[in-house]
Amino acid sequence: MPGKKSPYGLFAGGKLKRKRKRFKWNDVTYKRKMLGLVEKYDPLEGAPMARGIVLEKVGVEARKPNAAVRKCVRVQLVKNGKVVTAFVPLDGSLNYINEHDEVVIERIGGPEGRSLGDIPGVRFKVIKVNGVSLWAIWSGKKQKPTR
């Protein structure tokens, strides 16, 4: 008769804890968290938002089955010089953003910190332009300040 995989008995607790501690490292999410890989490769370096300068406007084609060009901007972050692509939400709001504008970006809110919906490779979205909320400019409540 073959033996059991796990120890059992009154004093098996220590052995069970040691086994659990060892086999936890086979879990990808645990390993990434413990080794700090998310912060290590994160352009925002763990911060919720970041300031950046708009380098260019780009159109990103939506994934199947949708056919659209999602309006995005390439942004160079002030804090570390990394260049990321950020989605511009709201209809026609790309018209309020020019090159060399200062924008604030945040995570787009996709699953596991990744891209959202049908926009491939875009993990961030624009929330402010030159210190004013993009939504306020778009809805006509405020005017975009000229730098």
From Swiss-Prot:
GO BP annotation list: translation
Keywords (A to Z) from UniProt: Ribonucleoprotein, Ribosomal protein, RNA-binding, rRNA-binding
GO cellular component: small ribosomal subunit
GO molecular function: rRNA binding; structural constituent of ribosome
Key word Ribonucleoprotein present: yes
Domain of life where this protein originates: Archaea
SUPFAM superfamilies: Nucleic acid-binding proteins (SSF50249)
Keyword flag Ribonucleoprotein: yes
InterPro entries: NA-bd_OB-fold, Ribosomal_uS12, Ribosomal_uS12_arc, Ribosomal_uS12_euk/arc
Job description of the protein: With S4 and S5 plays an important role in translational accuracy. Located at the interface of the 30S and 50S subunits.
Subunit structure, as described in the record: Part of the 30S ribosomal subunit.
Family statement drawn from the similarity comment of this UniProt entry: Belongs to the universal ribosomal protein uS12 family.
Protein name stated in the entry: Small ribosomal subunit protein uS12
Primary gene name: rps12
